A protein has these predicted regions:
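Cofactor-pocket helix-loop regions in the catalytic cores of large enzyme subunits
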Residues: 1-211
Length: 211
């Protein structure tokens, strides 16, 4: 009653919420006080991924990744077993890691700091933060053009091997990136498109982040 009498605006701050129950609760508050402002703020921004997906596919959302389908997973700075893009990927990842007929998914992680995903990878390649963008660029070049570089540095060799495995797996391969840069996110989507990846599900989008 005091709030109503004072005509003060009540600000309710939440993360991006796709939950019907949360939306109903906010609506009830608004009915009661009539001056509720609902502000959605994501502590971990996914603007780069949202911008990239919107540019390539016309929808501002995050795609889903069915890692159970993957034979080869290459991550460049994406802790997808942590809270990357809202999390929730570990169950289907785990299913793909169970040997079936002597086969299981292969996971290669390029990262600067140890992560849960890196700890579970078959191959973890340590890269500097400044090298992560170049790693994606070289992966794209290797998959589209067939080679990385004439200079056989340990990183270039690792990238070439990863690209070879991605191409061999084809539609059963996927590249993920946690680099907060629109161009890097576009590169990852372009690589998956070149691979005809079935793991990347562009029609099964998630609206769990707005920015």
């Amino acid at each position: 009653n005091e709030f109503k009498a004072a005509c003060l605006t009540i600000a309710v701050i939440t993360g991006t919420s796709a939950s019907p129950s949360t939306k109903k609760l906010i609506a009830k508050l608004n009915e009661t006080f009539e001056n509720v402002a609902h502000v959605e703020y994501d502590a971990v921004s996914e603007s780069a991924a949202l911008d990239a997906f919107e540019l390539m596919y016309g929808t501002r959302a995050l795609p889903d990744y069915n890692l159970e389908k993957a034979e080869v997973i290459v991550s460049v700075g994406a802790d997808f077993l942590g809270n990357w893009q809202g999390g929730g990927f570990e169950a289907r990842y785990s299913k793909g890691r169970v040997p079936t007929n002597g086969k299981m998914s292969r996971h290669i992680q390029f990262e600067s700091n140890m992560s849960l995903s890196g700890a579970n990878a078959d191959k973890r390649i340590l890269v500097k933060p400044s090298e992560q963008n170049q790693t994606l660029i070289k992966l794209y070049q290797a998959i589209v053009n067939g080679n990385v570089s004439t200079e056989a540095t340990p990183l270039n060799v690792a990238i070439q091997k990863a690209a070879t495995q991605l191409k061999t797996a084809g539609s059963k391969a996927v590249v993920l990136t946690g680099i907060q840069d629109k161009n890097a996110q576009i590169l990852a989507l372009a690589i998956n498109k070149a691979l005809n990846s079935e793991v990347l599900e562009v029609s099964a989008t998630k609206n769990i982040r707005k920015g």
